[in-house]
Amino acid sequence: MALFFFLLLLISHREQLLLVQGHQMRDLLPTPRNRSNGRLPSPFSRVINPSTHLSIHKKALPRGERKLQDEYALDSRIHSRPDPLWNFRNLQKHSRKGLVMIFSKITRC
């Protein structure tokens, strides 16, 4: 019984948040489910049918232009982010920089 009230509270809280953001519950698309087994789809799978309200405002690009746009987006994402610290080569580089700084401070004293 407590679980029921908790779920009810959770749903009403979500509805209030959406109303604050300018949405209503009926504006949201239902959660897509995998037709074969009823589970939620993998986050790595692509959405096959985008929502229809977006296609009203935005025309689909021809295939070649869409490919170019995808490549540009991928390219800009790759070049706009610095390499993560957990990359092995970067880890070596950063640790080397740290060691150089430590030794330079020691030798200055």
Swiss-Prot record:
What does the entry list under GO cellular component? mitochondrion
Keywords noted in UniProt: Mitochondrion
Please state where this protein is localized: Mitochondrion
Main subcellular location of this protein, as a coarse class: mitochondrion
> Remarks, anything else?
A stretch of 270 kb of the mitochondrial genome is duplicated within the centromere of chromosome 2 resulting in the duplication of the gene. The expression of this duplicated gene (At2g07776) is demonstrated.
What protein does this entry describe?
Uncharacterized mitochondrial protein AtMg00530
Organism ancestry: Eukaryota, Viridiplantae, Streptophyta, Embryophyta, Tracheophyta
